Amino acid sequence: FELAPVSGAALTGGTNGEITGTSYQNYLDKIESYAYNTMGVVTTDEVIKRLYVSFNKRLRDEMGIKFQLVVYDYPKADYLGVISIKNKCLDGVYKGDDGKKVYPNEAAAVYWTTGAEGGCKVNASVQNRAYDGEYTVEAEYTQAELIAAVKAGEFVFHSVNDDIRVLDDINTMVSTTDTFGDVFKDNQTIRVCDQIANDDALVFANKYIGRVPNDEPGRNALWMDLVKINQELQKLRAIENFKDTDVVVYQGDTKKSVVVEMAVTPV
């Protein structure tokens, strides 16, 4: 038989389960073994946000699994792997019993931002991209408020004539060090670094572990593969000023370990 396209068909017979803290933890347990660029969690619960930020930090820093996390209103993460959206969504707002406004879809901008960041090319940025999501984003800010938001590490939408656009493609990192300077506040920098880390790990796992001896010819072959990855990124204009001498591969402390040192300059 032939399938016909259908738009807006309602599903029937289903029920909504209760989402609990255990549900969020179960998801993290399941997703840990998968590869992805960006994860989003749509919640206003501070405990859940803290759980996901801790997960992101653990995987990035301890396991070398590189991805960025998109959350709503959590700039205190102060971390290059976490993107915090400032804007609330206004859809469905109502007054509660106490007379205060309640925003049931307050964190819904996470949906669009997660897709935009996850689908962004390694040589591109989400900066100044027009918002075309289905939710109504609150975006009326003064210039002083926008400047303060960027300084605080907030990913913010703002009004530009008749459009709503991303002001700057930044993460929550505001505390810099000698190792991690201002350039790491830019999500394009993180995309490039994550792409290299993930590609290098994939090549090493698929071609070298258990297959190629850790001797000079084997390490030279690995060096050539890693150089090729960076050369391709330079062709894409994701990095610049790359030289093959920027990659160094040598034996580690044990016969089974390899150390790679690499210098790259994201555009």
What is the predicted function of each stretch?
Residues F1-V267:
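Surface-exposed assembly/interface segments
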